[in-house]
């Protein structure tokens, strides 16, 4: 649901939007999104095994990249520079080219290994944005809760949004 709400709020007419789904992400989509992932016209998709995506090269790095949600396995592989598929390669490129890389893990609790991987990624310049929703605005639906996290991702991407009330804003 996090990925869907992010995609719902990235207009491919204003932003170049690419989607890569890992095998596990495809399972998550099947379980969490009845009807599958909805993509707006203009969103480009890439096979996880295809290394021909334009953003898989330092000569054409992405402006920004979001892995949402991000498993601890993926986070660990990114932290240690493994690039066996296009998702991991693109993350590696984003880090080495000093582009914005936002990772949105939702797993809990964290082990020391996870925390050390967080540390490595933070030192490398990644933005670690755990999927910890806020409740101060009194969300009424699951989508409202998810949107508190997605709004923060959009903020870090520099994409204006009104998905969730800001601290001290009036509630509707």
Indicate residue ranges for each PLM-predicted region.
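A cross-family phosphate/adenosyl-ligand binding-site feature
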Residues: 1-102, 106-172
């Amino acid at each position: 649901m996090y990925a869907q709400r992010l995609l719902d709020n990235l207009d491919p007419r204003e932003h170049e939007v690419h989607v890569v789904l890992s095998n596990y992400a495809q399972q998550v989509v099947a379980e969490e999104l009845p009807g599958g992932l909805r993509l707006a016209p203009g969103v480009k998709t890439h096979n996880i095994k295809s290394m021909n995506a334009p953003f898989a090269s330092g000569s054409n790095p992405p402006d920004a990249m979001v892995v949402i949600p991000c498993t601890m396995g993926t986070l660990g592989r990114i932290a240690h520079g493994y690039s066996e598929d296009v998702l991991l390669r693109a993350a590696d490129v984003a880090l080495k080219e000093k582009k914005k890389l936002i990772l949105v893990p939702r797993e809990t609790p964290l082990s020391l290994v996870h925390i050390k991987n967080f540390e490595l990624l933070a030192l490398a310049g990644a933005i670690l944005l755990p999927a910890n929703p806020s409740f101060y605005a009194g969300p009424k639906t699951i989508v409202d809760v998810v949107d508190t996290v997605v709004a923060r991702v959009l903020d870090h991407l520099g994409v204006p949004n009104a998905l969730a009330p800001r601290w001290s804003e009036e509630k509707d």
